[in-house]
Amino acid sequence: MKTETLLILPSKERSANLETGSLQFIGNATVLIRFGGVTILTDPTFIHRHERVSIGYGLHSTRLTDPAMEIGELPPLDLVVLSHFHGDHFDQVAERELDKSLPIVTTREAATALQRRGFRQSKPLDTWASVAVEKGEARLRITALPGRHGPPFADLLLPDVMGSLLEFHSPQAQPFRLYITGDTLLFDDLKEIPRRYPAIDLALLHLGGTRVLGILVTMDAEQGVGMMKLVRPLRAIPIHYNDYDVFKSPLTDFQQAIDAAGFQDRLHYLRHGETYTFRLSRQAAA
């Protein structure tokens, strides 16, 4: 059953730009999304090169890159969308420096862990449940989509993970749909996404081919191409690659696989700190 809750954010703006939005790639799966005066941060990780995060069961991963900015350099945030509670998606810097009053939309498991750490506005979403966000004139909906962090025999040892669909609304335009895959592998439940949402404008693909004890737990190049074939986004941006030493499938592997599949015109690549701007399509006149 699909359920929806309402989140109303305080606003001081009298008017907002509801025609365009932007995504700035901070690094790993951390992206700064802006639309209509709403500022969203995804999967916040801000440790630096050579520093480590815990990935559970006494295992650690070392960062190979630096984030494009520090938490103190971010603009004022309205909310966080967190795919799951792993150290390379919510690290010790985020826990220490993020405002504890920020709403965090995430899995039920992650919300419980965050609330224990003082993030009292953590908002759990079950799969297919949504939160409608309002700030001034801006309207958007965040829906939790299926995700599975590993193969069936290993999934019970891994945290629950969700994909996210962000739908940005404007009275004069069609909704813009942004799909963030989260740290999922391809599995049958994902087939329901294109049935419910056949028109995805942009996808952020969590890649990297992460392997823990030899087990694949995030999409590699081949699975990334499979995701493109499944959800058929108009455009896609790869993220979550080359940033940690547990990532075994480099971006170059994905680029080669995308070219071989003939999807190169749909891909847009961002370096750390670079920004992608999107525009809502105007509705056809009646």
What does each model-found stretch correspond to?
Residues 2-18, 73, 77-88, 106-176, 236, 259-274, ...:
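Metallo-beta-lactamase
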